[in-house]
Amino acid sequence: MQSVSIEAIKRDTGKNAARRLKNQGYIPAILYGKGMAESIPLAVEYNKLQRLLQKHGRNVLLNVIVDGSTHNAVIKEIQEDTLKGKIIHVDFQRVSMYEEIEATVPLKFEGTGLIESRGGIVQHQLWELTVESLPDKIPQEIVVDLSNLEIGDTLFVKDIQVPEGVKVVDDPDEIVVSVLAPRESEEEAEEEATETAKESE
């Protein structure tokens, strides 16, 4: 996991304060977690946060700078306006670099085109994994190579290779991907089976 700095300012609570911040290009945030007696209401520049997320994704180790002090943190939650799709609030969780944390990591699938070229249909059940590791070991994404799968094969959580120092929390027997036969092929197989049964009668 990369380490990226973002500056934040302390904010007053209340609707009027929130409106002023919005007019200045800020969105509300909050910092809480390890070693903190109480949470700190913050505000971050919307455009800077957007650029950070576009470049690094949500699984990024942050140096949240507040009044000259730096806090190691991760993005715990992002709230979005469901209609506009814009971020309206972000939670930063302060972490210890020496204690493991849980994080949700997206899966990046490779080899799908090869399966489809062989006539298979890739059916996804999981698009992300929950993992546990030290903050600086959490990957931004986990690459899953599907190129060796054949029609009828199933890939389970336990089959996915993760980086050293990373432990998967999800059920190892949970299905990630199944490779199905094309519907036409299934129907043809059923018709052939029916005809064979009739001939045997």
Swiss-Prot record:
Residues 185-194 have a biased composition (Acidic residues). One of its GO terms (cellular component) is cytosolic large ribosomal subunit. One of its GO terms (biological process) is translation. Pfam families: Ribosomal_L25p (PF01386), Ribosomal_TL5_C (PF14693). Keywords: Ribonucleoprotein, Ribosomal protein, RNA-binding, rRNA-binding. CDD domains: Ribosomal_L25_TL5_CTC. Gene3D superfamilies: Ribosomal protein L25, beta domain, Ribosomal Protein L25, Chain P. GO terms for molecular function: 5S rRNA binding; structural constituent of ribosome. InterPro entries: Rbsml_bL25/Gln-tRNA_synth_N, Ribosomal_bL25/Gln-tRNA_synth, Ribosomal_bL25_b-dom, Ribosomal_bL25_C, Ribosomal_bL25_long, Ribosomal_L25_dom, Ribosomal_uL5_bac-type. Residues 181-201 are annotated as: Disordered. Part of the 50S ribosomal subunit; part of the 5S rRNA/L5/L18/L25 subcomplex. Contacts the 5S rRNA. Binds to the 5S rRNA independently of L5 and L18. This is one of the proteins that binds to the 5S RNA in the ribosome where it forms part of the central protuberance. PANTHER family: RIBOSOMAL PROTEIN L25/GLN-TRNA SYNTHETASE, ANTI-CODON-BINDING DOMAIN-CONTAINING PROTEIN, RIBOSOMAL PROTEIN L25_GLN-TRNA SYNTHETASE, ANTI-CODON-BINDING DOMAIN-CONTAINING PROTEIN. This is Large ribosomal subunit protein bL25. It comes from Thermoanaerobacter pseudethanolicus (strain ATCC 33223 / 39E). The lineage of its organism: Bacteria, Bacillati, Bacillota, Clostridia, Thermoanaerobacterales.
